From Swiss-Prot:
Protein known as: tRNA (guanine-N(7)-)-methyltransferase
Family affiliation: Belongs to the class I-like SAM-binding methyltransferase superfamily. TrmB family.
Binding locations of substrate: 122, 154, 192-195
Biological pathway: tRNA modification; N(7)-methylguanine-tRNA biosynthesis
Cross-referenced NCBIfam families: PRK00121.2-2 (NF001080), tRNA (guanosine(46)-N7)-methyltransferase TrmB (TIGR00091)
The keyword Transferase belongs to this UniProt entry's keyword annotation: yes
InterPro entries: SAM-dependent_MTases_sf, tRNA_(Gua-N-7)_MeTrfase_Trmb, tRNA_methyltr_TrmB_bact
Protein source organism: Levilactobacillus brevis (strain ATCC 367 / BCRC 12310 / CIP 105137 / JCM 1170 / LMG 11437 / NCIMB 947 / NCTC 947) (Lactobacillus brevis)
Role noted for this protein: Catalyzes the formation of N(7)-methylguanine at position 46 (m7G46) in tRNA.
Sequence positions that bind S-adenosyl-L-methionine: 44, 69, 96, 118
Pfam families, per database record: Methyltransf_4
Keyword Transport: no
Length: 215
C-alpha cells in the first residue's frame, strides 16, 4: 500500500522522542525504563496508524504497550494519536519488526499482536510472512512462557497458511475464529482502522496461541 508523504512527519517525530524510539537495540532487556510503571509488556508488530494499540492501552492501564512500525508517514500519525491520548503506558518504535529478537530480551514480552500483516501471496515470498517459521522462532525467543501470540487477518489464504505454520511449530491453540465479528464467546475485539474499513467485505479471522513450555 502506497502511503502519501507527510512533510511534517520527521519534525514531529524529532520533537516527541519521549514517546518514540528510533534505536531500539540499546533498550534490550530494559524497556520498562521507557514507562512510569513496571508492568507486563505487550507488543504489536505493524501498528499502522495506531488505533488498535492506543485503544488497548486505554482499556488496559495495568499493561505497557509497544507499537512497531517501519513507515515514517504512518508512524507519525500513530505518534500524534499517542501524544493526543495522554496515555503514558504506550511507546512507539520506528523500525522493522522482523528483527524483534535483536531488541527484546528472552522472556521480556508478555504478548504479541500481528494485525492484518502483509500476506505476501507469492510462493517465493513465503519466508517474508510474519507467521513463517523464521519469525515464529523470533517470537518464541522474546515471549515469556505461555505468552500469547494473537494473529488477525481478512486474508483466508494467509490465515490457513498461518494455522499450519503455528501447528507445525508446535504451538498450543487457545482459540480460532473464522468470523471474529460474529463471535458470541466474549472474545476481546478491538479493531484496527483497516479492520473497520474492510470488515464489511468479508469475515475477519483470528487465532490466539502460545508456544509450548519446556517441562
Amino acid at each position: 500500500m502506497r502511503v502519501r508523504n507527510k512533510p511534517w512527519a520527521k519534525g514531529y517525530m524529532a520533537d516527541h522522542l519521549d514517546r518514540l524510539v528510533v534505536e531500539p537495540e540499546p533498550l534490550k532487556g530494559n524497556w520498562q525504563s521507557r514507562f512510569p510503571s513496571n508492568q507486563p509488556l505487550f507488543v504489536e508488530i505493524g501498528t499502522g496508524k495506531g488505533q488498535f494499540i492506543i485503544e488497548m492501552a486505554r482499556q488496559h492501564p495495568d499493561r505497557n504497550f509497544i507499537g512497531i512500525e517501519i513507515q515514517t508517514s504512518v508512524i507519525a500519525v500513530a505518534l500524534k494519536g499517542v501524544v493526543n491520548s495522554g496515555l503514558t503506558n504506550i511507546q512507539l518504535v520506528h523500525t522493522d519488526g522482523e528483527a524483534i529478537n535483536t531488541f527484546f530480551e528472552a522472556g521480556e514480552v508478555s504478548g504479541l499482536y500481528l494485525n492484518f500483516s502483509d500476506p505476501w501471496p507469492k510462493k517465493r515470498h513465503t519466508k517474508r510472512r510474519l507467521t513463517s517459521p523464521v519469525f515464529l522462532a523470533h517470537y518464541a525467543d522474546v515471549l515469556q512462557p505461555e505468552g500469547q501470540l494473537q494473529f488477525k487477518t481478512d486474508n483466508r489464504g494467509l490465515f490457513e497458511y498461518s494455522l499450519g505454520s503455528l501447528n507445525n511449530f508446535g504451538m498450543v491453540f487457545e482459540g480460532v475464529w473464522l468470523d471474529l465479528h460474529a463471535a458470541t464467546d466474549g472474545v476481546e475485539d478491538i479493531q484496527t482502522e483497516y479492520e473497520q474499513k474492510f470488515s464489511k467485505k468479508g469475515p475477519i479471522y483470528q487465532v490466539i496461541a502460545h508456544f509450548p513450555t519446556n517441562n
